[in-house]
A protein has these predicted regions:
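C-terminal structural segment of proteins
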Residues: 1-270
Length: 270
């Protein structure tokens, strides 16, 4: 089946084109989309591209930073204001992938990909769509209805400004280092002292990145010591149904999640 490609200079025009194409996909970096096309994915009939510079911008907005959806992992690593996200971007594939893979594309990545989105979820990020005039959608809500948002163009992702890179902790659990697909990823944002206000997110433990709400509640007010995090580790997978796939079983994911969460919270190997 032939694929129609449209290129627009304005993000508003691109958004209209994508919304009117029932078989359309937006082209960001193409690291996953081109694989689907090469595998003859029959659900894709139209590709919409956009060259609007707004997609490549990183700008300050008060106490938050707006990261354009077209910003690549390599650009994240090179941006001083985004130093707290550089370790996460660094584990996304190899140099060739990082030079193409975009923040917006990662939002739609299916397991075993989407590690960067896991970190964004821990950071309480929000998503801004083209034409929303400053309004944004919490990332958690976006992920809950992600399948129905492919017809909209993401303009940027909003994250809090973090001056201490150690406040965001991240681990990618893989059998093939350093570039293997993750069987699990864990991100923890520790904005306060101890576990106060801690946010924990898992990747590849559900169809989309997901919060570890029970572990967060158990950690509230606790110290980041072995004794203080004990209840959080017991609740590490409470309320979750990890998948069984070619990378790991549900049982294995439940067994290793507390181990890696413990190391992350104690800052071991960070």
């Amino acid at each position: 089946m032939p694929v129609h490609v449209e290129t627009h200079a304005n993000i508003s025009d691109a958004a209209r084109a994508l919304s009117s194409a029932r078989d359309g996909r937006f082209f960001g970096g193409g690291t996953l989309l081109m694989r689907a096309l090469n595998e003859a994915d029959q659900s894709i009939g139209t590709i919409v591209r956009c060259t609007d510079p707004v997609l490549r911008q990183v700008r300050s907005e008060g106490d938050r930073i707006a990261i354009g959806a077209g910003v690549t992992m390599a650009e994240i690593m090179a941006n001083r204001d985004l130093a707290f996200l550089a370790p996460v971007a660094r584990i996304i594939g190899g140099p060739a992938v990082r030079s193409a893979a975009t923040v917006g594309g990662n939002l739609f990545a299916e397991p075993p990909y989407g590690d960067f989105t896991t970190a964004l979820l821990a950071l309480d990020a929000s998503v801004r769509f083209a034409g929303e005039s400053g309004q944004s959608t919490p990332l958690q809500d976006f992920l809950r209805d992600r399948a129905n948002r492919r017809g909209r163009v993401v303009e940027s992702v909003m994250v809090p400004r973090i001056t201490d890179p150690k406040a965001l902790r991240f681990v990618k659990v893989t059998r093939v280092k350093p570039k293997g697909a993750a069987l699990m990823s864990i991100a923890a944002w520790l904005p306060g002292s101890g576990g106060r206000g801690c946010r924990i997110a898992y990747g590849n433990m559900a169809p989309t990145p997901v919060r570890a709400a029970a572990a967060e509640r158990a950690l509230e007010g606790a110290s980041l010591s072995e004794q203080g995090i004990a209840r959080a580790l017991q609740a590490a997978t409470e309320g979750l149904t990890p998948p069984t796939d070619m990378f790991a079983s549900e049982w294995y994911r439940r067994e290793v999640a507390p181990v890696h969460l413990k190391r992350l919270l104690l800052g071991q190997g960070q």
